[in-house]
Amino acid sequence: MSLLIHISDTHFGTEKPPVVAALVALARERRPDVLVFSGDVTQRARQSEFAAAADFCRELGIARMLALPGNHDIPLFDVVGRLFRPYAGYLEAFGPRLEPFVETQDLFVVGVNTTRPNRHKNGVVSAEQVARVSSQLRQARRGQLRIVVTHQPAAVSRPEDEHDRLRGAGPALQAWSVAGADLVLGGHIHLPYVLDLATGPQAVARPMWCVQAGTAVSERVRHGTCNSVNLIEWSTPRAGEPRRCAVERWDYSAKAGGFETAERRILPLA
């Protein structure tokens, strides 16, 4: 079995130390194979915040990581930096690739940079990005769980969040479904949920799921939610067995002083 941990929206600069410590403990206990970090690493793209985030990732002790920038990882008040060096701090902390790719024997994970320096927070996926990701997905093996990662949500669970939905998501989801994607992971709105993308008026062509993470360690939790992360389990099916994965949401409990399983779902795949 392979295990992936999906965290998002840590917003270092607003982190809660007890929650950070609890997440490190969870990672060391469960020992995931891959860390997916779907953006908004920092609160204000400050060097000290990026340094704290990088230290945190090292403390997790996970060998493979795919990280993406979020809109908060581009300077907001430093106009010169936003115009001419929008990703300088992020790249210094997390390496030279804004659209990374991670592959293991069982996992195939493609990152898409949906931030734009000329936009305050709204995300965009371009036709070129859709085509690139589709081409990559077609190279995956059937035995691999095929995952696309964005920052802004590719689908939303409530009408009031529609304005935060990724621009260009409709055509992207259709194309990525045809190309073989199983899951699309994201963050941005600090609301964890799992959506079946193969149902509804804009249903995709084959089973595919949107999996959103809440804010992992920040004090900026939405009303009615708490700090949370996702754990995704995948085992390559034997001949004749159906493809499916498990998604667990782990919520932080101040009473317990750690993360606890809040929900577990088995997702059927094609």
What are the residue ranges of the model-derived segments?
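A short C-terminal boundary segment appended to hydrolase-like catalytic domains
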Residues: 234-270
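Active-site neighborhood of phospho(di)ester-bond hydrolases with catalytic His/Asp-centered motifs
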Residues: 6-8, 35-40, 64-71, 113, ...
